[in-house]
Amino acid sequence: MRMCDRGIQMLITTVGAFAAFSLMTIAVGTDYWLYSRGVCRTKSTSDNETSRKNEEVMTHSGLWRTCCLEGAFRGVCKKIDHFPEDADYEQDTAEYLLRAVRASSVFPILSVTLLFFGGLCVAASEFHRSRHNVILSAGIFFVSAGLSNIIGIIVYISANAGDPGQRDSKKSYSYGWSFYFGAFSFIIAEIVGVVAVHIYIEKHQQLRAKSHSEFLKKSTFARLPPYRYRFRRRSSSRSTEPRSRDLSPISKGFHTIPSTDISMFTLSRDPSKITMGTLLNSDRDHAFLQFHNSTPKEFKESLHNNPANRRTTPV
């Protein structure tokens, strides 16, 4: 199931990378970002405000040029003049900087470049050995491309809005499909970047878990059983040994002493209570002890007097 999920994620990354790059390239290269009314012919010194309003026609514009849709100049395109002479702005104002950024279109171009490198990283991840590192690079490229794209869109909207204080001079306009292609490219680029980073994190966690398990297998400590298990094995082995069933020296000493010795060495408190049975028992035990003590002595003397057991020294 996890391999299927990873295959789906790689498919989303590949298709999304191609879609984001294609949409942004089309958006930058086409002239349908904005629909508005404007004058298509070249301005002259004799033009006044009334004549210019009468000659305004529907136009569509992109990042660098404007094309006419109506009138005698239908289909004619001209370069956008971001710094007209009759515009009342100063070169050190924020509007001038906004126009400069809008004229350069640096952020859309940067977005296309980053998307291109991100697509190369996604393609290289299919053949490179350390594919998880390449996928991480692709994710970084796509996230950066999306941020550059949204900054360019914000700058474009701000440049078209003009001065908020001049509501009357504000013209009616609407955004075209090229603008929406750029917006969709931003969304897809961010999704692809997040999925690529997620693939890298998941792969990194798997590699880390695999290396950790291999380290535990190779370590000598992992080969030994746990302390409790070893303690139980030792206790069980000791209990199964025949020596463990023997009596202790203290218990042996107590059990080897005959009961007659105890009765022989104990003194009665009252001599009148001594009966004939106890005297007979003591005489019998005394005779047994004399026989027991004399037997080893006679056995040793017989062994010593036996000529076969004598040690001879060769001459």
Swiss-Prot record:
It is found in: Membrane. The keyword Aminoacyl-tRNA synthetase does not apply. Gene3D superfamilies: 1.20.140.150. Pfam families: PMP22_Claudin (PF00822). The modification Phosphoserine is found at S248. InterPro entries: CACNG_subunit (IPR051072), PMP22/EMP/MP20/Claudin (IPR004031), VDCC_gsu (IPR008368). This is Voltage-dependent calcium channel gamma-3 subunit. It comes from Homo sapiens. The lineage of its organism: Eukaryota, Metazoa, Chordata, Craniata, Vertebrata.
